[in-house]
Regions:
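Carbohydrate transferase catalytic cores enriched for Leloir-type hexosyltransferases
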Residues: 1-349
Length: 349
């Protein structure tokens, strides 16, 4: 008989957000039976919006009470077997005082453990008093959890250092390649390179600007640098078409919990030039990694792409086999087996 998972989060973030997407994919895969031996019991969440005071009250007071009551009712009523909280920013919701197993997905620890990477501050180094209290509640919640499920090896190692007695499992994100291999249409011309992400400093788009400035003039004349997210908004279908049309995704980030654009690009057959930093260096094929601050290495890699584009007669690229093969390693079947093993371990210990 399948064990029933009660999924818990805070605000009902949409699929378009990073944490929202991960949550919805977990819901979908539980419903589809893609985690062997487990099925969805229910989802506990609240609506978003409201003024700052309303949001604080909901986060710190009303929703934790709602979750506690719902967990009690589900366990007592026999409709759920354990609780899974779908991101570390909701770890304060780990039930206290209830005899129920609980796991938490940890996407990253940037805010709980801010750091400086290659001179760039990652995470909030100066939280205000309210946020400091909130972070303490999150730490306490993670300490109460029976299992932490990390989406990367690098974050898992941090978890083991912070909570050395806590069981930690690694379950990388997975991807369904089919939508990424349906040929799309987008009006991009010339020598196309992509960046995907926000303008926040850790994404290091300023480094890409420096690399572009250092390119030979003939490469710059042909270059069509498309900055998705920070400058240009695309639909999901348009983004897939952009990956298919691009010579490469440029991903110089100083730090990621996972680096989903890297996996998406490879699933679409798009090569990647990525900084050799965690955790996206666990995702990209090793041949696609570059020293994060070596501008010359990035310039030379782009020149090679430009030469290949010229030799091809400036035709759009064909899907890159290295990218496709690497993306295939992050398949949903393996993901489901690893998630099931993580859940199983809570009941074995």
């Amino acid at each position: 008989m399948a064990r029933r998972v009660l999924l818990v989060r805070g605000g009902a973030l949409p699929r378009q957000s990073g944490l929202g997407r991960a949550h919805h994919e977990l819901v979908d895969r539980l419903k589809a039976g893609q985690i062997p031996g487990y099925e969805l019991a229910d989802v506990i969440e609240h609506s978003t919006g409201g003024n700052p005071l309303q949001r604080w009250w909901r986060r710190r007071k009303s929703h934790p009470k709602t979750v506690h009551r719902a967990v009690w009712d589900a366990i007592d009523g026999g409709t759920a077997d354990f609780v899974h909280i779908t991101d570390q920013e909701q770890a304060h919701l780990v039930p206290a005082g209830l005899e129920v197993a609980c796991s938490v997905t940890v996407h990253d620890l940037f805010h709980l453990s801010p750091r400086t990477i290659i001179g760039i501050e990652v995470g909030d180094h100066a939280p205000n008093g309210t946020r400091k209290k909130d972070l303490n509640h999150l730490r306490n919640g993670l300490a109460r959890a029976d299992m932490l499920i990390s989406i990367s090896e690098s974050t898992a190692e941090e978890c083991r250092e912070l909570w050395p007695e806590k069981p930690v499992s690694v379950v990388h994100h997975a991807i369904d390649p089919e939508p990424y291999q349906i040929e799309g249409e987008i009006g991009l011309r010339n020598f196309v390179l992509l960046t995907v992400g926000s303008n926040e400093p850790r994404k290091r788009l300023d480094f890409i600007d420096e690399v572009v400035d250092a390119l030979p003039q003939d490469v710059r004349n042909d270059l069509n640098l498309v900055k998705v997210g920070s400058h240009l908004k695309l639909s999901d279908d348009e983004l897939i078409a952009a990956y298919q049309r691009a010579e490469a995704l440029l991903f110089p980030s100083a730090g990621e919990g996972f680096g989903l654009p890297v996996l998406e690009a490879m699933a679409a057959g798009c090569p990647v030039l990525a900084s050799d930093l965690g955790a996206h260096n666990e995702v990209a094929d090793p041949s696609m990694l570059l020293p994060p601050t070596d501008k010359t290495a990035w310039v030379n890699a782009i020149i090679e792409l430009h030469e290949a584009w010229k030799e091809r007669g400036e035709e759009p690229p064909k899907p890159d086999k290295t990218a496709l093969n690497r993306a295939a390693e992050f398949n949903i079947e393996d993901w489901g087996e690893k998630m099931a093993a993580a859940y199983d371990s809570m009941f074995e210990n």
